[in-house]
């Protein structure tokens, strides 16, 4: 589920735009429905995970808000991450007008 979150957030610029962010949100709600949540492996430190997420975000031009969604949904406050994603979807044209 979280893999699809990352995939759709990363590719939305190049593929289906707002529809991809809506798919990411859909997968998060599925995770909630089925109580299916990703847990970081115990042998991976939080700092290592953050370093790798930063590297991934830089390599894929992830915006600060998109980064926040991924970070919060994976190792932070999932509900907050979902609210940020919902805001990105609801304000897609305004936020991504470039």
Where are these regions (language model features)?
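Intrinsically disordered, low-complexity regulatory regions
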Residues: 1-98
């Amino acid at each position: 589920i979280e893999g699809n979150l990352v995939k759709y957030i990363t590719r939305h610029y190049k593929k289906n735009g707002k529809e991809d962010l809506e798919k990411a949100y859909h997968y998060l709600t599925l995770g909630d429905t089925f109580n299916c949540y990703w847990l970081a492996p115990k042998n991976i430190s939080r700092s290592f995970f953050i370093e790798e997420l930063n590297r991934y975000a830089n390599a894929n031009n992830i915006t600060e808000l998109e980064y926040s969604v991924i970070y919060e949904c994976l190792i932070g406050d999932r509900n907050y991450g979902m609210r940020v994603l919902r805001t990105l979807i609801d304000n897609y044209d305004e936020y991504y007008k470039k």
